[in-house]
Amino acid sequence: QMIHTSPQLLRNSRTLQQAIQGTFDVEIDVEYTHIGELVDRIDDKVLDNYFRNVWQGEMKKYKYSGLALIDEINGLKPRKVLDIGCGYHEFKGKIDNIVGIDPYNDAADIHVKLLDHHPDEKYDATIALGSINFGSTDKIYAELEHAVSLCNPGAVMFFRANPGLPHDKSESNWIYFYPWDS
């Protein structure tokens, strides 16, 4: 919307960079070949800032978090478990054979976005607790399809959608939380 209302911003990279920093409180390279590339870069940086600096895990808040999920997954005796958007990787050391991926948190085993994760082996169990919630319907479907493609036949997926509760941090104002209830 900022660019739509002030298209002259695109003509001056310094002014554009200042406008982006002033609006989103992030610094990015503003060189781009198409506007979608710039928008994606802003989105990535806003998410990175939110999940690195603002968001804190709430392991005990939901049914499929914490000890109940740990016991359930370990009871399956999976050879390999994927934790998508593992955050602080709180399941590491508690669930056998777990691999945590997260593009924004240094605790992850692999720093990668879900759609860019292409392991050599598939998983017997997958956890996605509030991590497939950001972006358009097309992006959500693509992420869900990719998560399923990473699983062996008969694998189990534990999934939790964004509960639809407002996020009280101002840094979340620019993040699109997928409306699962609509």
Predicted feature residues:
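A short acidic, Gly/Pro-enriched loop at the edge of an enzyme's catalytic core
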Residues: L115-T126
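Active-site micro-motifs of SAM-dependent methyltransferase domains
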Residues: D116, N133-F134
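Surface-exposed alpha-helical segments enriched in charged/polar residues
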Residues: D71-N74, E145-S149
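A short, conserved alpha-helix within the catalytic core of class I
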Residues: F134-H146
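Short glycine-dipeptide loop
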Residues: C151-M157
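N-terminal hydrophobic or amphipathic segments with adjacent small-residue motifs
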Residues: R79-V81, D124, V148
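A short beta-strand submotif of the Rossmann-like class I SAM-dependent methyltransferase core
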Residues: A128-S131
